[in-house]
Amino acid sequence: MKKIFLILTLISLTLLSCGSDEDSLQKIDQLFNLYIKDSSGNDLLKPTEIGSYTGVSFTDQLAEKDNVNVSYNRKMLADSTYYLEYLAGATRQFVEETSDGGKIYKSEIRVSLTKKISDTQNAPVVQDKLEIFYRSSPNVFEVSRVLYNNQLVFTKVPDQPNVATIIK
């Protein structure tokens, strides 16, 4: 009887020590949405419309091999506005440690845009640079800021979506 009690006590203690609380989980916030519009506010990501960027590709500039494609999704809102949704996939390079013990990483992506100028012709491909900086701490891994062609287009605001609009 003592052996059974001892075994049950050990099993109970083992199970209790393996439990974790919600506070120990790291929040992941790395979804980034990119809108591209002209100076009048017109959507330039409509996939079939003349004057829009009908061809888009993302290429990882920090990958060990050349021309490594990075996946993204072209999505549409209820009002028919298109945007590019990027979740992950590009190489993350360590940049620095922060004063609070966190770490900063970055991904560098070449964004190739092909504009449809007529039913049968496309303009030359435009190649832009997208840099996404991430902040990592024990509590959170999140997009902290984004540069597009070396211009700051996004800075993280707590509990807000990661969204930037580029004017071309």
Language-model regions, residue ranges each:
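A short, Gly/Thr-enriched small/hydrophobic beta-strand-prone motif that recurs across taxa
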Residues: 24-38
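C-terminal motif of bacterial Sec signal peptides marking the signal peptidase cleavage site
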Residues: 14-17
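Bacterial signal peptide processing site
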Residues: 19-22
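Short amphipathic, basic-aromatic surface patches that mediate peripheral association
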Residues: 36-49
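Tryptophan-paired
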Residues: 52-116
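Short coil-to-beta strand junction motifs in C2/discoidin
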Residues: 28-29, 47-56
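Glycine-rich, aromatic-bearing surface loops/beta-hairpins
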Residues: 119-168
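Positively charged n-region of N-terminal signal peptides that target proteins for export
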Residues: 1-4
